[in-house]
Amino acid sequence: MLHGSRLKTALSKVKLSAVHGPWTRVVGMHHMMKPPGGRKSIPQPLWGGAAKIKGARFTPKGEFDSVYLAWEPITALLEVQALVLMPAGSVPLRTAPWALVTVDGVVSRVLDLTDASSLKALGTNEQEMTGTWVTMKNPPTQELARAAYASGRNRCNQLWFCETSWGNEPCRIS
């Protein structure tokens, strides 16, 4: 993957897309039963603070909120399973059970990392975006997300990558 100013320049030129749901999100039941993060509000199944607190594939620990969504429920479940079961995974098993939430809408200005031309322009590939990240000090996925967030071009939107394929359709998660 490109780094530093080269990555920043490439991100400024990559075409952003608009996408629409429905998507699936996996949420710990504790977020469905009470407000997240000790807040005094209603429960928030779209709260993105857990990724900020714990760190996630595209979310450097402590830097910004992220909401992870998947086209297919199995993809959302597989990503959570990776967090739970990997050595040094950031989600303890005691957070189970999980709830699947369907989210529908249109999101604009999405950096589509399933697009081969976008990956090429950023000097990366599907393997780098979907590979193991938990044990890395500075995973390329988080470096890319940090640069994309800093660019402001797609702030409040998602980064997309191809997690795996089921049948003939790629499963996307953001």
Can you say where each PLM-predicted feature lies in the sequence?
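Active-site and NAD+-binding cores of ADP-ribose-processing enzymes
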Residues: M1-R57, V84-S174
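Extended catalytic/binding region for NAD+/ADP-ribose chemistry, centered on the ART fold
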Residues: G55-P87
